[in-house]
Amino acid sequence: MEYPWDDLTLAFSRTSMFPFFDIAHYLVSVMALKQRPGAVAAAWSNPLSSWLSAMLHCFGGGILSCILLAEPPLKFLTNHTNILLASSIWYIVFFCPRDLVSQGYSYQPIQLLAAGMKEVTRTWKIVGGVAHANGYYRNGWIVMIAVGWARGAGGAIITACEQLLKGDWKPEGDEWLKMSFPCKVTLLGSIMFTFQHTRHLAISKHDLMFLYTIFLVTIKVTMMMTKDAAVTLTPFEDTLTRMLFGRQQQQFSLSEKKAEVKPSSNGSASSASKRGTEPPSSAKRHAKKED
């Protein structure tokens, strides 16, 4: 006997991402590119370079997953329909008369709708990446996690490499050095879908897809409406750190902070002592001049 919940989650898992969800993903990705300093001027002066950057933003996850599996990185170019769709979004975003697309996107309801639909595509990408890796390495769960994570959040890493080639790379924006919240959530989702695929997690795939997508959309909409990026996995990370490494990590960080404070206090004291010793020497110089 089938229940309404099963019908709902099963129908949701069979939802096609083309064209509406893909359009939302391309729109959010290209708008993020346009908001970079100098992106509009670069598009007018060098449209080909701007188009390549847009394609990296839109298909970066697929490119990185292909690299991890030793597949041709340009494999995404074989999907002509999606390339034409993403190129159309890039063109109307950058070259639409009177910038009508950007003006329409500036309304918060449209941003919330597009961002929520983009998070739905993230779930599908993770599931596709896990299944793709399983085709090469059956039940190789480490590879499956890596490829699922790369497919879902690899766009940020690929665009960081693009910024490095252009000379605009900054260490604080590198996903390898400092993972963002979407990158962490994608890694968590890749782990869950991998364990579900290898039957280590007792839940059906369509149920997990539905619940994980609801979680992603809720968090994303909440962060955008409150304009607060403080929704993080810090409590979970702190708990996991205590379980695996104890409290030594916290004590080490506290000792580092104390070590940073001590040199500054010593430096101020030494400078004060130098100021205190300066008047006698200057007085001696004046006395010699008077003699």
From Swiss-Prot:
Q: Which organism is it from?
A: Rattus norvegicus
- Ranges in the Cytoplasmic compartment? 34-47, 100-103, 157-179, 226-291
State what protein this is by name: Trimeric intracellular cation channel type B
Give the protein's biological function. Intracellular monovalent cation channel required for maintenance of rapid intracellular calcium release. Acts as a potassium counter-ion channel that functions in synchronization with calcium release from intracellular stores. Activated by increased cytosolic Ca(2+) levels.
Q: Which transformation does this protein catalyse, written as a reaction?
A: K(+)(in) = K(+)(out)
Compartmental location: Endoplasmic reticulum membrane
Q: Where is this region: Disordered?
A: 254-291
User: What GO terms describe the biological role, i.e. biological process, of this protein?
Assistant: bone development; bone mineralization; cellular response to caffeine; endoplasmic reticulum organization; establishment of localization in cell; extracellular matrix constituent secretion; lung alveolus development; lung epithelial cell differentiation
Listed GO CC annotations: endoplasmic reticulum; endoplasmic reticulum membrane
